[in-house]
Amino acid sequence: MALPWALAVLSLLPLLHAQDPACANFSTSPITNATLDQLSHKWFFTASAFRNPKYKQLVQHTQAAFFYFTAIKEEDTLLLREYITTNNTCFYNSSIVRVQRENGTLSKHDGIRNSVADLLLLRDPGSFLLVFFAGKEQDKGMSFYTDKPKASPEQLEEFYEALTCLGMNKTEVVYTDWTKDLCEPLEKQHEEERKKEKAES
């Protein structure tokens, strides 16, 4: 089980509608060490909009999700530890996300495919977006992450602005519900195990 990552390499067509001046704010930038520091903590999967049928089905069954990014700067990677509640069951997964610094993308290999997403940092450093298949009308999508379980009105407004720039609308958005999270006990168990390992080392 994994958070929505592209099932194939992202199209290299323009990311968002460049003809709209308001959309100039939503563009990829090179990923720096400061970016990795900003990403290196706990995030909540807050909302998404996908046209790809497989992604759409996946997020519709995702009740709640959160994850941790830990940067390994010298290797240009992020350690991903994710907790997902789907169909009233908690799933845990850990993997490595590779950072393509110059083109502002993140990628993950699942053993079969290399999956790529564009990273969009927002005005609020407590939120960011991943954009998938931007140039493919029937597959494009966007996922929205915040550093708290519930997004602020300002964070949501920026998400909606980016969604419009991608050529999608609010009716396509699927929201998660933190009250349905079942992974918090497992997260606490993992925290205790890490503390014990650290104390013994």
Swiss-Prot record:
Tell me the GO BP annotations in alphabetical order: acute-phase response; regulation of immune system process
Does Metal-binding appear among the keywords?
no
Q: Which cysteines are joined by disulfide bonds?
A: C90-C183
Glycosylated residues? Answer: N25, N33, N87, N93, N103, N169
Q: Where in the cell is it found?
A: Secreted
Q: Where is the signal peptide?
A: 1-18
Q: Which GO terms describe its cellular component?
A: extracellular space
Recite the UniProt keywords alphabetically.
Acute phase, Disulfide bond, Glycoprotein, Secreted, Signal, Transport
Q: Which InterPro entries does the annotation name?
A: A1A_glycop, Calycin, Lipocln_cytosolic_FA-bd_dom
Q: What does the similarity note say?
A: Belongs to the calycin superfamily. Lipocalin family.
What's the entry's take on its domains?
Contains a beta-barrel that binds various ligands in its interior.
Q: What does this protein do?
A: Functions as a transport protein in the blood stream. Binds various ligands in the interior of its beta-barrel domain. Appears to function in modulating the activity of the immune system during the acute-phase reaction.
Indicate what this protein is called per its UniProt record. Answer: Alpha-1-acid glycoprotein
* Native source species: Oryctolagus cuniculus
Upper lineage ranks?
A: Eukaryota, Metazoa, Chordata, Craniata, Vertebrata
- The UniProt gene name for this protein comes to ORM1
